[in-house]
Amino acid sequence: MNLNRLKNRKKHNSKRFIEIDIIRVLAIILMIFGHILWDLDYFGVSPINNGIYSSLQKVVPQMFFLVVGIGLIVSRKKKELSKETEKRYYHHLVIRGFKIIGLGMVLTIFSLVFIPKTPVFFGVLHCIGLSIIISVPFLIFRKYNFIFALLLIVLGLLFSQIAVQNPTILHLILGLQPENIWSFTVDYFPLLPWFGVVLLGISIGDILYSGDKRRFRLPDLERYKPAKLCSWVGQHSLE
């Protein structure tokens, strides 16, 4: 491979879709706002506005997991590479997933120390990290992942209706939980249905993007400084 071709490939792979970063940053801001509301309530400073907090709890997780899926397929599409490099890419995904799980474990330890009555056993970071790892074999199905997504989401909703007494960590990961799960933990995102939402994001990303091109029109957002900041934050977040 000559030097010019290498430079062109690097340039090709470095292109980012700024709208994905904007949605990701918006989700982060809303998540932080939700945590502030929860902290104020937990420490008795101010009671939670149930309407606002409930809305955030419904919207923000979906945004996060959808963007994870979209980001996975978009980055995969940019890899018009040899099998050797493709393997390195999948290896990179697995390593990234384990790093995010590691951050989740740090949060688990932190919660055991500071909120021992309701610690985090399998929260959003654990779920995102594991979802990234097990998404690898699903990336080849591209837009057809909506079939798996629908099945897993429905299965997860069914699991949530089954009360399991004395569940193991495997039960909790899969979504088989005790009836009063929220009295035991402050952050719980089981693999089912949330991995289904990631697969739905992969399907949506395959429909909306082709390689380094959008399949829809969008104004030039990169000329605005806030959008550039979102791009930087998105590039250095848990993509």
Which residues fall in each region the model found?
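Alpha-helical transmembrane segments and their immediate juxtamembrane cytosolic regions
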Residues: 1-239
